[in-house]
A protein has these predicted regions:
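Short beta-strand elements in bilobed, periplasmic/extracellular small-molecule ligand-binding domains
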Residues: 214-217
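Thiamine diphosphate
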Residues: 1-160, 165
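Glycine-/acidic-rich phosphate or pyrophosphate-binding loops and their flanking alpha/beta elements
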Residues: 5-19, 39-40, 145-156, 165-212
Length: 217
């Protein structure tokens, strides 16, 4: 399968889940073509809310929808979501609202969008909040399974996605398990931990390290 950005995988998975779970609603802050929530918007226009460039209002509205029994996915660039950190903290985290925040354009690999759009501090900030789960899938397979897990999980979640295409690293029979690491390659000298968009690059780094003499050889 050709490389695919996890934001694209998210859009495809969300559109498919919309058929199965009718309580899913989606909100976006004028970036649906970039976050890929536009796929859901076109298929379910009555369950999609374009909030404009007003992330704070979007997050508060998502919290209200969650408290009313809906499953809201609120989407924007990761860097714009954390700019409304206090609203996330008070309206979502402290109330344990069942809101799914989706932050795209994570990390530095966002191409021509530039440094002002990079989500760099979001993992540290979102991990500090009570009740929140943070999920950063590494490829198409994991992303699609993670989106379904998130929809069924009760509680706030931050889903961190990439703009840049990623190669698949997980096998076709991969099964997503929250909080459980996956061993992609065995070895004995070096352990490399990675998450999200750098998993594939970490595997490449491991291949380069194999060319060096082992201390056990």
């Amino acid at each position: 399968m050709p490389a695919k950005a996890t934001r694209v995988s998210f859009g495809e998975a969300l559109e498919e889940l919309g058929e199965k779970i009718r309580d899913i609603v989606v909100l976006d802050a004028d970036l649906s073509k970039s976050t890929m929530s536009i796929k859901f918007a076109k298929k379910f226009p009555d369950r999609f809310f374009e909030m404009g460039i007003a992330e704070q209002n979007m997050i508060g509205t998502a919290a209200g929808l969650a408290l009313a029994g809906k499953i809201p996915f609120a989407c924007s660039f990761a860097c714009f979501l954390i700019g409304r950190y206090e609203t996330i903290r008070m309206s979502v985290a402290y109330t344990n609202a069942n809101v799914k925040l989706v932050g795209t354009h994570a990390g530095i690999g966002i191409g021509e969008d530039g440094y002002s759009q990079m989500g760099l501090e979001d993992i540290a900030l979102m991990r500090a909040l009570p009740n929140f789960s943070v999920i950063q899938p590494c490829d198409d397979i994991e992303t699609k399974q993670a989106v379904e897990y998130i929809a069924l999980h009760q509680g706030p979640v931050f889903l961190r996605l990439t703009r840049q295409p990623l190669e698949d690293v997980n096998p076709p029979d991969y099964k997503f398990q929250f909080g459980k690491g996956v061993i992609l390659k065995d070895g004995k000298d070096v352990t490399i931990f990675a998450t999200g968009g750098v998993v594939f690059n970490s595997l490449l780094a491991g291949e380069k390290l194999e060319k060096f003499p082992s201390q056990h050889s």
